[in-house]
Amino acid sequence: MKDLKDDELPKTYKGIYAMHKYWSKKPYNLVADYIERFSSPGDIVLDSFCGSGVTVVESVRLGRRAIGIDINPVAIFITRMGLSHIDIRDLRYTFANLKMEMQPIIDQLYHTECLNCRNPNAIVTHTIWEEDNPKEVWYRCPRCRTRKAIKEASQKDAKAALEPTNTLQWAPLTQLVENSRVNVKAGMHVSDLFTKRALVGLSLLLERIEQVQDQEIKSVLKFCFTGALPQASNMVFVIRRRGKQGGEQKAGKAEVGSWVIGYWVPSEHFEINVWRCFENRFKRILRGKREINQVIPTSAIQCSNFEQLDQVEQGYWIKTGTATSLKIPSGTVGYVFVDPPHGNRMPYLELSLMWNSWLRFESNWEEEIVISASPERQKDEEDYRKRLAAAFGEIWRVLGDNRYASIVFNSLSDDTWLSLLNSCLGTGFEIVDIQPLDYSAHSVIQDTRKQALKTDLVITCQKQIPKQARRIRFNGSELELERKLSDYLVHHPEGAETYQILNALLVSSIPTGSIYRVSSILDTLEDKFKFAQGRWCLESKG
């Protein structure tokens, strides 16, 4: 067992990991450190909540055999795209033909008049909407070579956006799952996330992609299509940096934002030209595919079952499935690195419905391990606890004796923390290491919210033989908690952010078998300590 590289910082998402958006991606370089520490080349590494495939990709890159399982079909699609080689020349050739044919067709949906040369066929690149009305148009003009001009949307521009002349080929009619936490109201559909013009452009593009003969290249182009969907939607917010003009605060020029978590459609939002979204995403995917061709061994075989994986020296097996019933023989896995759903933080299937519906993927809603606020689903704390315990039971079963499993987790919920820890310890694992795991990038919410979780914790456990089940309980001593908080802040005179304090107390208390309630920590901080400039300090509130 090697030492972790304590001073290594999380690297940003680039190359392979910048090809497609997915939530809760972990820093690939730090995941690689854990794989190198707790496994050896040739070992089988399992991630039964594999998401976008960081664990699987890094395991294969490091000479391990890998198993990636996820209940979300688009997650497995993304993972496969992060592993599969492609002929770059053929891919570029197919894209060039696609561009030659489809860009003019799609751009016809975005024709506007150039104010400089009066060309009626200038191309709209961006439209700013206020609620249901286009207000501002950004365009380029091939005739006078204007690269970017901005004008107020005319009635003709509004009609082009609201009543596209081309026929809608096919678009998903899928109804989104009602859930206020992810901004979905009852009766909302996937199609509500796009303008009518964008739906037409996307439908034309997808219809043409489906006609590509080479199946691998078709898959990459569909991957590019789903990767482009967020920026082609109405969920791209407008950034306006405020400044003073004539002594008054004025909203600045508009800048392009991005899709944040959930299906929030801002009152002021962008509509971006569909082809522009697709081509920009293709450039990212091309860079990622070049890297895959370089770092993923050509000898790594894509296997269709465990038996095949067990016979090869290098390979991977990825499949859509549930973590509660692994089709893996007992004691055959060398290391596990998993990032299970953190209670109610991220309803993955609900958030992926936009992608899955365009790809016509069906989802197994019943067996998802999650707590959801949706009134349409029976996904409460009890269901989460039972399924999580079953998933850890399967991890314990397939893991080799005295081998290790690392679990990434964090939550502001007391019950969710207790469910996670007791699912783990109750299975028979012994906790041997707890370390914070920084994120590669922080969201707007993480940067601004007082109680934002800015890291996760990696809890590494060892499979005990003989099996010894334990349980964790809550420590209810308020005086002891206040003393520990005071001691921590004495040693941090510059103050500390909420997540730093939570990390310190959880890391120190979990191995003792008794943890403080997260809610009690937060309440005690509010009652007994001062919060200033984003940090808690020792000075009393009086």
Locations of regions flagged by a protein language model:
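Conserved SAM-binding loop of SAM-dependent methyltransferases across substrates and taxa
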Residues: V54-G63
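Conserved beta-strand signature within the Rossmann-like core of class I S-adenosyl-L-methionine
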Residues: W365-I369, R403-N410
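Nucleic-acid modification enzymes, centered on SAM-dependent nucleic-acid methyltransferases
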Residues: M1-L46, L62-P329, R345-R377, A391, ...
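A short acidic, leucine-rich amphipathic alpha-helix
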Residues: E497-L506
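Class I SAM-dependent methyltransferase "Motif I" SAM/SAH-binding loop
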Residues: F49-G53
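Short glycine-dipeptide loop
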Residues: P41, F361-E362, E394, L399-A405
